[in-house]
Amino acid sequence: MQFFSTRDHNRVVSASQAIAQGLSDEGGLFVPQSFPQVDVKAICALDYPEMAAAIVGQYLTDYSQEFLQEAAKATYGAAFGGKAGYLAPVSDEVYSCLLYTSDAAD
């Protein structure tokens, strides 16, 4: 997938170049040229690291799926119990997503 600058739509780069560069030369953000559709039923059947790799892989097409899966497992593996975070109730209808690895939320 290619990414274009928000300040110059003719400035198009690969995902890896957008990540390495951060901002485009003229100070714009890099955004994807399209937003892939996700099969919700299929994606929900995956564990969190697999889900993350599958979704991110649709945007970072110049990285191998194997690399993305290993990165997702390393990021969301044992330290997170395979989850992205913990939803803690704040009130009856409000929850906060805790994004740390402490077991204090258990």
Residue ranges with predicted function:
Residues 1, 11-14, 77-84, 104:
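Short amphipathic alpha-helical surface micro-motifs
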Residues 26-99:
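Small-residue-rich anion-binding loops in enzyme active sites
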